[in-house]
Amino acid sequence: ANASVATTGGAYSVFQNAASSLFSHNLFEVGFSYSPWMRDVKKGYDLMAFGGFYSFNHKHSISFGTRFYREPKLNPDDEEYPFIPKDENNNPIVGIEAFRPLSVSADLAYSYRIGRYLGLSVTARYIRSSYGELFTNNALGFDVAAYARIPLNRMLEGAWVSAGAKISDFGFTFDDSNYDLPTKF
């Protein structure tokens, strides 16, 4: 139930379905967004994205993007963050300093158009999540996607329908981690 895999291509299509960039009216797009995320809950959450693509005559395209997510500063004695290590008396382990959790991803995709109505893409994504000195996770994930845009000229002049499919986040982690990438279709 992720409708964004079938939306029209744009600067941020690398994050949803890079093949859709082949059907954009533009040969080049770039975009930047910043959102002070969840500011009604607690200040300090930042979400930024930078993305774009370059299409070679709507037959091949290269897409790129990076996302940056930062949480508020955490102190070792914060009660609302149970993952901070505690000793047997439930006190924060000495030596842990305040930190600000950070997640960064960098995406690079190649897309190829097959015929007039179908495009395919493959995306590689490097992901790094850091929780100060506590732990850091690094992963490499891949997406494979298809995007189809079919005109409905016989019924409605100038109208079209689009469909998309994607297998995302299959890959591996680099670190000794108990976490796996959440592969989904």
Name these PLM-found stretches.
Residues 1-185:
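Subset of outer-membrane beta-barrel
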